[in-house]
Amino acid sequence: MKWVNKGTVERVKQEFKDEVKYYETKHTKGFEVSHDFLKPLLKFLKERERFLHFVDMTCIDFPEHPNRFQGVYILYNPEENERVIVKSWAKDGKLPTVEDLWPGAKWAEREAYDMFGVVFEGHENLRRMFMWEGYEHYPLRKDFPLQGIPEVELPSLTEVLHGRTDPPSHDFELVHTKLPTLEDLERTEKARLKKKAELVLNWGPLHPGTHGTIWFLFDLEGEKVVQSDVILGQLHRGMEKLAENLHYFQFIPYTDRMDYISAICNELAYVETVERLLGVEVPEKARYIRTMFAELQRINSHLLWLGTGALDLGALTVFLYAFREREKIMDIIEGNAGYRLTSCFLRIGGVHYDLAEGTLDVVKHFIKDFPNRLKEYHTLLTRNRIWLRRTKDVGVITREDVHNYGLSGPVARGSGVPYDLRKLQPYAAYDEVEFDIPVGEVGDVYDRYLVRMEEMAQSVRIIEQCVQKLEKLPKDAPYLNKEHPAVIPPKEDVFHDLESMVKSFRVVVHGEDAPPGEVYFAGENPRGELGFFIYSKGGGKPYRTRIRSGALYNLSIFPKLIQGRTIADAIALLGSLDPVVGETDR
């Protein structure tokens, strides 16, 4: 994938003269524009230069700068396969909304307001995204402490139970950060959705059909949904704040806990981003191991989607069959990483371990058997009359919707948009294997089902080629770039080699010593584009880490799709979007 070309740069300069400044770093290209010309520039890029696809929007806090907050917009041109970054300083803590250009910016702007306090003028309903209404602080500001602001005093257990006020026997602080009260949650609900019809129905945040702590609000006229909104944040853990206070390698385990169904895919997107910033080359063996395990994880994720989605619509058998194959994949992952879910298998510069003895034989057995299992799933569902009635012509997403909402993954490809970063921006070993990109025609729930089913078949093709390549490589081929100064050596080297021990100590204590600069890179997660924007001022920790969640943007179109449909369709529709709350909330 390229960055903005010279022709576009020249046309922008001719149109906006001195109001726009072109900038270029080692890994990115874009424009810096004054506040008053931000929206005209973005409109020009969309309508004249065909940067149709909204990728992401966030802010960076520079307390020492007079304007303090800088807005960062990332756009994509699907015709030229180019990205561009646009930056603009807020004026008096305000930026113009671009929700009218890209509806997908609605949630991104809410998040920037929630985390930084930046106000977006003209926004339809600017509310907090993850925190509750009435919360007074902005967590991603640099003056907000990592541990939060203790401001609520809680009595000790001895005082509550026995009425004694003597010091407790533990050393826990009695003053804690705020938690939302029931009144706060009620205020949040009413601020999100102004009642227009007969009844506001709460679906979630604890309901088996939501597959996670997502809180849906439906304004109903009978069984028809007049309007809806989604309240997130029940699983918000401040991932981006944590990333800014950790060394680069220390954040790898946290990526596992976002989309915890696809931990290795998360790790892969993150370490590929950091490796570009640090200039780390990855050995060939590690690239193929990464690719093989990422595709195993993709099948694993799609099997969970298939089993639970079918179960929600009444097909119990498919659920049992899908979990049978899923267990085999998780056994392979556990045998190599040591953990079934939060594997923490990848490292900056390669992978943590070489392949366990017999791994390739087990993988070959699995990919030989799995196509037959896939046929079983098709037999049970693909031409099933009930399945067709529940999925055909439900939740139709157009190609225009894909670009306007920043949709990606199977959701985008189900609408006929071949947006797959494994092809458009090859990483790991994807440029050395052959596979096809399945796309839909209508863009409904059924098309998204067919795309994911075919993706599993394509993953088998990729895994098969990875196995063949790994069998040809020498057993002692390197799986980690030990020579790079930013790479932590394997534990066995640290225990037996003085130089490795000193290097390990230096990196663990002081960090990787990244150069100043910025980088945006994304991986093709089972839920779509999982991107990381890292802004570095040098040193062992990033100044700003932005996590672009594909699951979040895919979920953002839900209120539009459910409008005018019945509550029963919400189950099928949400299942086809396949969000994981650990990633949406971060």
From Swiss-Prot:
Pfam families: Complex1_30kDa, Complex1_49kDa. It is a peripheral membrane protein. It is an enzyme of class 7 (translocase). GO terms for cellular component: NADH dehydrogenase complex; plasma membrane. Keywords: Cell inner membrane, Cell membrane, Membrane, Multifunctional enzyme, NAD, Quinone, Translocase, Transport, Ubiquinone. It comes from the Bacteria. It is found in: Cell inner membrane. NDH-1 shuttles electrons from NADH, via FMN and iron-sulfur (Fe-S) centers, to quinones in the respiratory chain. The immediate electron acceptor for the enzyme in this species is believed to be ubiquinone. Couples the redox reaction to proton translocation (for every two electrons transferred, four hydrogen ions are translocated across the cytoplasmic membrane), and thus conserves the redox energy in a proton gradient. This is NADH-quinone oxidoreductase subunit C/D 2. It comes from Aquifex aeolicus (strain VF5). The lineage of its organism: Bacteria, Pseudomonadati, Aquificota, Aquificia, Aquificales.
